[in-house]
């Protein structure tokens, strides 16, 4: 599937500037239209209050600067874009806008100052949005996404879905590494990993696979993150496991670790 409609979530944080730059680069690389959704999010403490002028002024200033950046990208680089400003909670706003996108580019947390809301944002979006989600960690300082990709692979339906959704990005990458953690109980065959490598190579990327052992009781999510970082990856692709009604119970394993402790951009599908 070609990526022709991209959605990027923006807000008044400093990280939104880099998120927009990465989204613009992806849109231009794939000849896509970019929809910029600026969410001026309600704070939990303000639900029963009118927003302060200071907060509104800050959000409006940030949105104006980002809108001006988009206009500049349109003039200088030919970017096709749409702009939407919403005073809303991030979750509902993103879920609605995602209905019309091929890929959503989001921050790794909601804009709320409430830690529980931040943690719930990623899992809620990953489970309830059928569109592939590219989370950009607030801590990232990468200047590009998708040149060197790591695929978190366990032969599951979720991993297969995520890999397939990432094909347009894989086709533009320089190097793709299939990373498999050998847990001893569901070991992946070398032949299967080699076959998958051949599949990806047909999409024009330099592909290889790497198996790592689970040692010292470390979580699989931690192992994947650590190895991906050491390999110089600028994107990890992983399946999202869970069910909308019992997200908190089922996001207790690899998916939760990847979502809550993101070190590099993460593409997930459910």
Language model features with spans:
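Small/aliphatic-rich secondary-structure junction motif
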Residues: 1-53, 128-131, 145-212, 233
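Generic structural signal for helix capping and beta-alpha/helix-loop junctions
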Residues: 44, 91, 113-115, 143, ...
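Hydrophobic alpha-helical segments and helix pairs
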Residues: 81-141
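Glycine-rich, Arg-bearing micro-motifs that act as flexible, cationic patches
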Residues: 106-124, 146, 238-260
